[in-house]
Amino acid sequence: IKYTSPIYGGLQYELMYALGGVAGSVSSQDTISGAAAYTRGPLSVAAGYIFAKNDGAAGVGTADLTHNNSVTPLFGSVSFVGSRQIAHVAAQYVVGPFTANIRYSNAQWKPYIKLAAFNRTETFNTGGTSLQYLVTPALALNAGYVYTRSTGASSATYHTVAASTEYYLSKRTTLYAIGAYSHARGTTFNAAGTGIVSAAGSIGDLESSSSTPSQVAVILGITTKF
């Protein structure tokens, strides 16, 4: 069930509620979300919130904020997560060929059963900033930094820096190159949620953490829109 508002003087919002489909329970496995965006001249701001509830092990069809049954590099016990919520705010400002962004998010994951290590709410606070320079209408250069801190039974920090370039061959096709470096400190959970291990370097949504505190990634690609 979703409602998207008209645009009122640069402001637009959207509300969504998804039923869990569990017989005899209205709220079980449900998802609630909302978002708003405002644009005025070179300034754009946005905020969003999502809450998803699982009453059992995450699997196909559950209200899972990640891929079903997958392991996120920052947190290995996805299948044991019950309710989770994420709040996010961001702002963007454009000056000539430059576009600057800043953002912050707070994510809270609660276990549906208490494990030896993952036995209470885990909170991830993330802040980031990025800058884009449009060299020509066809060439863009980007740089960014992201900081994440986890608290709860785990205690880890993650620093990630990245640089990229995009070349627009046409309105449909873009070539891109990305280089990134991540470094982690502290401790997090193992995949079973039963023990504490050293945090590993993790870049974006690669879904493959390093076996050491640091990770480097270089990505070359092409995108085509249809």
Q: What would you call each of these model-derived segments?
A:
Residues 1-39:
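Aromatic- and glycine-enriched pocket-lining scaffold segments that form the walls
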Residues 12, 44, 219:
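A residue-level signal for beta-strand positions that form part of recognition/binding surfaces
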Residues 171-219, 225:
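Predominantly the C-terminal beta-signal and adjacent terminal strand-loop region
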Residues 9-10, 138, 171-172:
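Short loop/turn motifs that connect adjacent beta-strands in outer-membrane beta-barrel proteins
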Residues 22, 41-43, 65, 170-173, ...:
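Short, surface-exposed, polar/charged, turn-prone segments marking secondary-structure boundaries
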Residues 37-167, 178-181, 213, 224:
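Detector for outer-membrane/organellar transmembrane beta-barrel domains
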Residues 31, 64, 192-194:
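Short alpha-helix boundary/capping motifs
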